[in-house]
Regions:
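Generic signature of intrinsically disordered, low-complexity segments enriched in small/polar residues
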Residues: 18, 43-45, 75, 114, ...
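Conformational-control "hinges and anchors"
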Residues: 68
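Short, mixed charged/polar active-site loops
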Residues: 37, 71-73
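A short coil-to-beta-strand element that immediately follows conserved catalytic motifs
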Residues: 54, 73-79
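Charge-rich, low-complexity linker and terminal segments
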Residues: 1-12, 73, 82-154
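A positional/architectural concept
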Residues: 1-62
Length: 154
């Protein structure tokens, strides 16, 4: 998104719109699917040779759950977007694209979970335990899994 500094009114200007999710550079990411455009609402003002941009950005995405690997939809939002850009003499435009991209990517959870109650996958057979129990036999401590081998190292 490019703001033309020369067209900003003395009282500031409002910008509403959508940006292509292509600016994120995440095409083909196996853990995330884009479900809509990046939406924004900004207010831009020139204050003491600086362009100050405040507002909100957001987008809908489907993320892979870190426990069960199923996809779930969520909205990523920053309700307090704030940036200041120096505007030297002769500069007519300021590009916000990289800052919008950075903000959206930093808002994504590194270990997204579909629900706090998600049971995940069986470590032996890989069945999604949210869909029901698997037929694996529990190990000595009552849980299915191969981690019991590590307990023997003590």
């Amino acid at each position: 998104m490019i703001i033309e500094v020369t067209k900003i009114s003395p009282d500031g200007s409002e910008y509403d719109g959508e940006e292509s999710p292509g600016i994120l550079g995440i095409e083909g990411d196996p853990y995330m699917r884009v479900e809509g455009p990046i939406t924004y609402h900004f207010r831009a003002e020139v204050v003491s040779k600086e362009l100050v941009v405040t507002g909100q950005i957001g987008m809908k995405v489907a993320l892979a759950c870190g426990r069960c690997a199923g996809f779930f939809s969520t909205t990523v939002q920053d309700l307090s977007f704030l940036r200041a850009y120096p505007v030297p003499e002769g500069v007519e435009t300021v590009d916000l694209t990289e800052d919008i991209r950075e903000d959206i990517l930093l808002l994504l959870e590194p270990f997204a979970v579909c629900s706090p109650a998600c049971k995940g996958l069986c470590p032996k057979c890989g069945k999604n335990l949210n869909e029901g129990a698997c037929s694996c036999k529990p190990d000595e401590e009552g849980k299915a899994g191969d981690w019991s081998e590590l307990d023997r190292l003590r």
